């Protein structure tokens, strides 16, 4: 069974899962939020590096279907441009995460910061992997609400 079409979804959903974990797992222990977020960014960078070995992937599911009048798929596209931008976004994102662990070390709202940072990474990766303008617009607007 070929699972290459699931790989872009893993890259996209990785920071979202990290943000949810930070939301629920760090109510008592705020120090673990940085670890979860940095590990998520590291796995995203490692996955972006591994994506170069994959062929071009296009995977989508129908999101909105109003017959022939309007059909909006929800999908990801992993081509050479997306692979390049994945390296840029995950590489810079990982460095930001590393810097933030030291910068936010004594801050009381560290868990909230790393949760928002993971959501921001999710939005940026969504823009990179979007296969249509509707999906790109959704992730662009989500990015502005996180910041």
What are these regions (language model features)?
Residues 17-19, 119-124:
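Hydrophobic, membrane-inserted alpha-helices
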Residues 1-9, 20-115:
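Transmembrane helix-loop-helix hairpins at membrane boundaries of multipass inner-membrane proteins
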Residues 135-136:
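Short hydrophobic/alpha-helical segments at membrane-entry points of transmembrane helices
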Residues 146-147:
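Conserved small/polar residues in nucleotide/adenosyl-binding loops
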Residues 130-131:
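Helix-breaking motifs and short loop linkers at transmembrane-helix boundaries and internal kinks
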Residues 13, 39-42, 91, 119, ...:
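Hydrophobic residues within alpha-helical transmembrane segments
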